[in-house]
């Protein structure tokens, strides 16, 4: 039987006939269409009802992005970036700009868990590169954040260092789980439920056949500003509104490509 929107399945835009952009997608329409890229999530969902700071409800997690399956410290990857505004924040950004590469996995989580997640990445790096900080340089982890405190007991800082290791070590290629998973578990987007999203596009052969993939942790926007293919969807869907959150939120966007680009060129792509 043909599936309907009421069937309980979560549809992706293209499954509903909404085609965005001019280029075809990769096999999975995900950042993992870029060869070597791996994604891992650890998702925390527990409790309900009124907020009890330090206890719950818990709606949070951590997402790991690995540029390849090898030793990232020994096989560094060219990188660039761009800051649209100060939130979300990202550790390791200055060193990435200065050096022109990344040398650790990229982790996404909530604002108050950044420190713990950094510790988890450092544990992972020491485990895989024992000479870090002894006979080799120290490490500057890349951890990006958004504020999930509307839905999550953010003061509880429920993500642990062990969960960070699990997200990194369980990362895989292939289809990417989206929505309320990993770092995106407690996020809100245009006053709908937000979270993790991903897509990819493949250039035609005459343009190099390169692949670009994107993964976002979406936690931004007011309902009235949501536009899809030129249609003011947010202004049409005026019900289903939850309690308003503080501010306008933020978004973290990670772009990967197999095109042979320098750090300067990657800076431009990130813009």
Please place each PLM-identified region on the residue numbering.
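Alpha/propeptide regions of enzymes that mature by internal proteolysis
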Residues: 2-271
